[in-house]
Amino acid sequence: MSKIKNLLFTIVSVFLCSFNAWGQNGVSTIIGKIVDVVNEPIIGAQCVLLNHPDSTQITGTTTNVDGVFELKASKDKEYILHISFIGFETYTSNIALNESIDMGKITLSPKAYTLDDVVITAQMVDRFSDKKEYKLTNAEKEQYSSALSALEFLPKIQVIDQSVSSVDGKGIKILINGVPSTATDLSIISPSNIAKIDYYTQPPVQYSNMGLGAVINVVTKTNENGGIIGLNTQNAITTGFGNNTVNFKYNFGNSQVGVTYNVNYRNYNKRILDESLQYFIDDEEYRKEKTGKESPYAYEEQMAEISFNNAKADNYVFSSKLSLKSLNRRRSSVQDIMMYSAEETTQLIGESSDKDKYIRPVLDMYFNKSFNKKHEITLNAVGTYYDSDYKYNYRELLGDITDFETATDISTDKYSFIGDAMYSLNLKSSQLFVGTRYMYNNNRQKNIAGPNSIETNEVYSYVGATGMIGQNVNYNVSVGVNHNVFATLDNERYSFTYFRPQLSVGYFIDETSDVMLNYEVNTQTPSISNLTYNPYYKDPHYVYVGNPDLKPGNIHNVSLSYYKGFKKFVINPEIGYSYANDAIVPIFIRSNNNITETFGNIDYVQNMTASLFLQWYPFDNNLLRLRLFADVYHQINKYGEMQWEHTGYSIIPSIMMSYKKWGLQLYYQTQKETLSGQMLKVSPSMAYAELSYRPLKNMTITAGIRYPFYDAWKLTTETHGTNLISRVETERIINNANMVYLNFVYNFSFGKNKPNVKLKMSNEDKDAGILGR
């Protein structure tokens, strides 16, 4: 009994001391927890304290991942507490704040919608100086099979084959609770575990110079003393095609351990490679027409990862990942060749095979420390090693006689280090930051031509600020310096320094619309693959090589966008312009009586773009979503006395329907032409239809068909802007046409939810060091 009395006395003492602390300095605190009718916490509810009786706002906040809020205001005054969240009735209460108050649980009742009351994206977004924060309702989360597919809730984001990109084709950087992550990691997280999504349409300064279209940070509910098991499989039943992931994570105290395995594979037997080739050497024409036959193509890409995280909210975060990734790819082709000359026409048989494989271990260490909620230090170190091999053989046969033969055999040892450090100071309405990134690469190769070695060093240092000016203007400004040093096997060293400013200014017109102006200067750094010579012949007088004399290019980008969210409709037009000085692009030159395909620094590349994104929910309860993205672009290239241009466009309509446990998605993308230097790539059009069903909570089964009514998947590359050579290569994979597949997603979690913490950086080396064919 005495122990019970002591325990009660301790509890009462702590309770009274807490109230005493709340009441200090003339300020009292209001706390509470917002839940729905089934007692689930409501995350991101708006909690505002208004002055009584004029209703001027005193302070405000949003509920955390546990639905808890905390407001502080002067005591001995009367206020109005106003709580709101999309899909629920607004809660108001008059409060006489004489002392600190615990409101306990506040239950919000669902709102009875009429058609005109449905408000979608516009009012589900909190806007900050550098991002937009999206919160999905439970009904919206049920429309998606995984956290990865839920990213399609965001404007201009598309998810295909367990990968995510912007609709204009740019890459997306994925963070999970700020931790550098991948689409694979998201594919095994249940959408019900999403607390919010931070959407950076203009990548923060630490992610600049990566060619990204956006950065997305998915904040989840984590588990305390429990774990998560996730499975996401996508496999075709008509051909060899699969993307499969399994994951297990276990939480104990402030720590988490995880294991992930991912395997993607392709196994086709109907790949066809056609080619048309023509060039002149000493006024003699070399012309060939190659008609491909059905040939095999296969690869297996595997990744195993173990991870450990230890974090204490508002204090520190430590994260480490050790992963091993491997690739084994094989492809071959057989072609009927017609070779034309002034004297005769010769029929040949062409045979090619290429094999490439690599093993890539990566160690990623991350640490973030906060001091007094104002100061933050972030450190990130990534070490990568590549052991890769590439073998290519090609020959043309005249009967049993080899008329032409070429081969390349490259073995590469490459290791790299990326180190990042950043300090930030959080002020009332702004954040100041300073940081530096160091990147080191050492690439050693053995090939038929002999050994090769390249070493690169790059340092990028920056300082900047982000914040708000008043209630309507947000800004993000930084200045940086990029310094590059290259060293070759012959001890030749090249050094380059560039100034890199970045400015983003936005104006919030009203609660549902804004306009954004972005300007930045980036450095286009040549990759190890571009710098390595590695010659091989594609024809007797046509050779393909890297360029050790490349220097970095400088790219100026400016864009202006407008966003408007009506009750059921979103419109987002954007115009952009870029100017790349000394741009690194594929070019063709004449050298040593050969036509050489390589990479070069041309005078400039100008790109002009205009795009329009539309989204419409025409019916109640978001039953149907219609989307349309369209863009048009024009490019001008200048290289010496030559100038060439190209204009292209793309249109992407999509339809998504959701009714109870069923879902239907239809997608189409027109053919798209992309010009890079003197090579034009014609990406194929794409279409798919998917029907999904959720038999159990956190389980989704999807049946789909890819490229319906197509005869093949087709990719074409051709020369453009040069009179030295004319070459058109068309790759077709018949196996992909009318491909039927099944997708099974299941997530099981156990444990109690608690808030998460954020990381700020991500680094990765994806360059294997081999010049692609």
Question: For the regions a protein language model found, what residue spans apply to each?
Answer:
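Short acidic/polar hinge/loop motifs at secondary-structure boundaries
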Residues: 72, 153-155, 179-206
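Face-selective signature of the C-terminal outer-membrane beta-barrel domain
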Residues: 301-329, 351-492, 498-501, 508, ...
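Short, acidic, small-residue-rich periplasmic hinge/interaction motif at the N-terminus
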Residues: 35, 46-50, 84-88, 102-140, ...
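N-terminal periplasmic accessory domains that precede
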Residues: 102-107, 117, 147-150, 184, ...
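Outer-membrane beta-barrel signature, preferentially recognizing the C-terminal barrel domain
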Residues: 494, 511-513, 523-572, 579, ...
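Outer-membrane beta-barrel translocator/receptor signature
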Residues: 209-216, 223-273, 299-302
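Short, acidic Ser/Thr/Gly-rich low-complexity loop/linker segments typical of extracellular
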Residues: 53-68
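Extracytoplasmic beta-strand/coil segments of soluble accessory domains associated
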Residues: 148-181
